[in-house]
Amino acid sequence: MANINFGFEHHASKLYSGAIEQGIQNSLVPMVIETSGRGERAFDIFSRLLRERIIFLGSGIDEHVAGLIMAQLIFLESEDPERDIYIYVNSPGGSVSAGLGIYDTMQYIRPDVSTVCVGMAASMGAFLLASGAKGKRASLPHSRIMIHQPSGGAQGQESDIIIQAREIEKIRRLLEEILASHTGKDVQQVREDSERDRWMNAEEALDYGIIDQVFAKRPAPEKKD
């Protein structure tokens, strides 16, 4: 069976991705202490962010990571189906099937999902960044965004390889159509632009339609009358 990925994770960014994941595994996750009338409670930083409806995607995208992201999205919808959810993206990309699972869940749930690039959104990371709610996709000013075509490996009999090659082409077309729908580009333009790695800074990603805003500083909350 073909294993289809956005290929960036498997060459230039392999060391980067591995370093992130190894660093998370080998370091202590910060804890946040909250005090109330009932005493103190300790939360790991990611659980505390989840209480604020913030999900952090900070690694390569595989089935395990996708399962965690999808579970958090569904949980937050059950908590409040009207309030926005925020996904902060710093990812080199990864598995297409895992990424599409996250994408479908983002579109399925009722709350708007706002996406913010912090550091890098490459490959499937860029795809998910662009998939946030229209008008609610952003990047910090020095982030890097990259799009390209998916890659996949195939083995077995010649007939099996042909079938798998056709499947990869179908997936490529699907991804191009989805990205075109979120950026306002036509499908052929997306195909040409993603033929090879296309790197963009935040302003270029804004011009391309992957994001809607570039934030140098978090906007101040609106004052209530």
From Swiss-Prot:
Coiled coil: none annotated. The active site is at 123 (nucleophile), 148. Its main location: cytoplasm. SUPFAM superfamilies: ClpP/crotonase. The keyword Transcription does not apply. Keywords: Cytoplasm, Hydrolase, Protease, Serine protease. It comes from the Bacteria. Pfam families: CLP_protease. The keyword Flavoprotein does not apply. It is found in: Cytoplasm. GO terms for cellular component: cytoplasm; endopeptidase Clp complex. It catalyses: Hydrolysis of proteins to small peptides in the presence of ATP and magnesium. alpha-casein is the usual test substrate. In the absence of ATP, only oligopeptides shorter than five residues are hydrolyzed (such as succinyl-Leu-Tyr-|-NHMec, and Leu-Tyr-Leu-|-Tyr-Trp, in which cleavage of the -Tyr-|-Leu- and -Tyr-|-Trp bonds also occurs). GO terms for biological process: protein quality control for misfolded or incompletely synthesized proteins. GO terms for molecular function: ATP-dependent peptidase activity; ATPase binding; serine-type endopeptidase activity. InterPro entries: ClpP, ClpP/crotonase-like_dom_sf, ClpP/TepA, ClpP_His_AS, ClpP_Ser_AS. Its EC number is 3.4.21.92. Belongs to the peptidase S14 family. Fourteen ClpP subunits assemble into 2 heptameric rings which stack back to back to give a disk-like structure with a central cavity, resembling the structure of eukaryotic proteasomes. Cleaves peptides in various proteins in a process that requires ATP hydrolysis. Has a chymotrypsin-like activity. Plays a major role in the degradation of misfolded proteins. This is ATP-dependent Clp protease proteolytic subunit.
